[in-house]
Amino acid sequence: MSSPAATATAAAAEGGRPGRVRARQRLIEACVSALHLYGPSRTTVSRVVSIAGLSPGIVRFYFNSKAALLVAALGFLADEFEERVLKPVAALKHSPVAALGLLVELYLDPEIASPRKVSVWYSFWGEASSRQEYLDICGQKDEDFARLVHELTETLIEQTGARHLDADGVALGLIGVLEVLWQGIAFQSEASLNRRALVARALAYLRSVFPGQFPGPAAPRRRTR
């Protein structure tokens, strides 16, 4: 009698392109989970297939090595970030207030910024100095994000006439705020996170730089004697 893992392997191998795509994605998702639990150096093929519920033999259909599987997992995260964050925000670039508000929401969304995925991003960054593939993918993601944030802040400065502001400094400040919030997410569980509070903290920075441009709690009224 075949095991469930062996049955899944056979189905993936014989199920045509849709089945192969699903099995490959299943391995990548399992690899992300393994990286979250064990880090790159302790993630093994056996741990990945165990999480995926597949047999070890299936890996050779899609990846010629553990290294190739890890690069595919990082590439998946980078593609997801581009599709779910960069592209929707860039589509609103002529409305920088709406675009920056959406950027904050999406950057801190649990689909992108789950403790699992954020911790994996940091794991890869930790290994990037010794792995050119990791450095290339992580670096490109950060460059694209920084370029978009700078473009949006520059446009907003022009539209509001706040020419005393420096676009580089404002963009760097927002990126820094979001980075600090991601660092906090990496070391917490989803149940302990207050997503609304995280978004509010990032928007508070934008309100402090561009008063009246971003919705938020009204300023407390000054008490009169």
Regions found by a protein language model. Name each.
Residues 26, 30-68, 72:
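Helix-turn-helix
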Residues 133-139, 143, 156-225:
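Hydrophobic/aromatic-rich alpha-helical bundle segments in the mid-to-C-terminal region
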Residues 98-99, 113-136:
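Amphipathic alpha-helical segments used for helix-helix packing
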Residues 26, 30-37, 84-88, 120, ...:
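Solvent-exposed, amphipathic alpha-helical segments
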Residues 72, 86-117, 164-174, 218-225:
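Hydrophobic alpha-helical connector segments
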Residues 1-22, 214-225:
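N-terminal intrinsically disordered/low-complexity leader segments
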